[in-house]
Amino acid sequence: MKKIILVCSALLCHFILVAQGKYIQGKIDGIPQEGFAIKNLFNPISVSSENYDFTKDLSQYTLATVSSDVLNEVVNTYEYALEVDIPFEGSFLTLQLMKSNFVTESSVFTAQNNHGKENFKYPLGAYYYGVVKNMPGTCVGISFFANDIIGMIAMPEGNIVIGKSNVKNALSEEYIIYNDKYLKIENTSRCGADDDRLKTLIPKYDTKKAVRTITTNCVKFYVECDYKTYQDFGNSVVSTTNFATGLFNLVSTLYLNDSVSTAVQQVNVWTVTDPYAADMNTYDALVSFSTQMQGGFNGDLAHLLSKRSLGGGIAWLDVLCDAAYYRSAVSASLSANLTPLPTYSWNTMVVTHEAGHNMAS
């Protein structure tokens, strides 16, 4: 019988994370000031061009535009270290960033239809982690793409989200920066690892078979995006993959700050109805996803991302050395129909939590 219990990962709580994790600060401290390429990327604005009342969702926020020329320069040159000023609540936060290697040219990117998986040429973003300059106890993860930025700053005072002010408008060049403690809406997602059905589920698969040794140096993820996520990103494989890699950069940054190395080995996007479409909760989705993964996958852990409203996330516990069936997790209800605002801190929390179950953190 496979044991599933509820574990509260310390990585979930930003105030625990930033108090304990110092790895990234140490890496940044090792870069001389002249080693940072300074990029003037953001320009604060006072009036939104989006037809949306942000005060319905937030009590405080900052709006900005981004220089497309500078953004393209950041993506194309992919400097080892950057310094970027972020407008925030009438002032600026200076981000000191260094290049992340959680996704590389060797990572695999596929789109899946009724005929199977097909590789596609994915234009990699520029992925970074770092800190806020002169602010101890901070941790930054941020990804730059040709027409998008996905970022989050973990601070003792809350999580600061950086993203397009309307994530449903792919053409928008307006960004919003806000502390998630000022959100007026509540995310009711929950972790399903305490589901009694999982605690009593008797596996059909022998966990002593197909067991493999996982490297202690880096945990590699196979990431799958369901059809609903693909639809929500305008049926764009690239935009959906940007969402996945941008999200996992945030997750990877949080783990790295606690000296746990992770990487994305493959991202697969469903472009047709997926095998999980009939599942109405995270429990059923996990069983379906685990069944799909039982034959093996490209990575150490498999993670399904879904924007369907399934109630949150769920995962098997402590499975790094188990059969492929169990090395899986589901993170659903990712910003599903709550607001056009970017809610990357919620998404990051769900994925980090469920991946932590798999690793027994």
Identify the function of each model-found stretch.
Residues 21-28, 32-53, 58, 170-326, ...:
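Fold-level signature of zinc-dependent metallopeptidase catalytic domains
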Residues 82, 128, 149, 219, ...:
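Residue-level detector of short, conserved catalytic/binding motifs and their immediate flanks
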Residues 303, 349-361:
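Active-site recognition of the HExxH zinc-binding catalytic motif
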Residues 20-167, 287:
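N-terminal prosegments of processed precursors
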Residues 98, 133, 154, 224, ...:
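Structured loops at beta-to-helix junctions and adjacent beta-edge loops in soluble globular domains
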Residues 1-24:
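Bacterial Sec-dependent N-terminal signal peptides
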Residues 332-352:
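Short pre-active-site segment immediately N-terminal to the catalytic Zn-binding motif
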